[in-house]
Amino acid sequence: ETNYKNQPYFVIETTIPEVSKLILRTQEDTLQQVDDLYTHLEEITRQTLERDKMLAIIYYPGPDKYNTTGTATLFSRKLWYKEMERKLNRIADINTVYIYKNDEGLKKWRKANWTEDKNQIIERLFFKYHYPCGSFTVVHPSGHYKSGLGEYSKSWVWKLTEDLVQAH
């Protein structure tokens, strides 16, 4: 069993026997249609997102052996999200949205207002594989984004957000 938390990459199995792919855990690129992303998220979350603010997308892919175990309580998860959002808002003007592919097992994560990834738009844009635990993406209004794939800490979310702020 592999612990991915401190590794810079994942090993992803392919459909070809004995052939795997290495995927970097931090991804960076630029969306050409960033306005379409904001529009889609507004439609599915029923929130108004300020287009001049950055966007943090917290993503839950569904249950796996990493996010269905552990000792976190509902209270500790609430505190975790609250602290993450509080510092994100100090780092940048930012909209934070919580998106899921499969809500099975999500009850223990209920602090946040989770929204289904209808038509798998977010998954196709940022999370092409099921990365263990969950993932996140931070998007600058210019379309420049950074994603953290798989189990993540608040400090990693903050770091990639700070990187984008400094780059712009």
Regions found by a protein language model. Name each.
Residues 1-88, 92-100, 167:
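Non-globular targeting/processing and membrane-anchoring segments
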Residues 64-68, 104-108, 146-147, 156:
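Short catalytic/ligand-binding loop motif for oxyanion handling, primarily in non-cytosolic enzymes
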Residues 70-74, 110-113, 151:
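"Short basic amphipathic alpha-helical interaction patches in structured regions
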Residues 81, 85, 123, 154, ...:
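Extracytoplasmic/secreted envelope proteins and their assembly/folding machinery
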Residues 87-91, 128-129, 160-163:
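Structured segments of extracytoplasmic/periplasmic soluble domains
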Residues 103-132:
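Thioredoxin-like thiol-disulfide oxidoreductase module
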Residues 133-148:
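A short, hydrophobic beta-strand/beta-hairpin element that forms part of a small beta-sheet core
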Residues 145-166:
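Non-catalytic, surface beta->alpha helical segment in thiol-disulfide oxidoreductase systems
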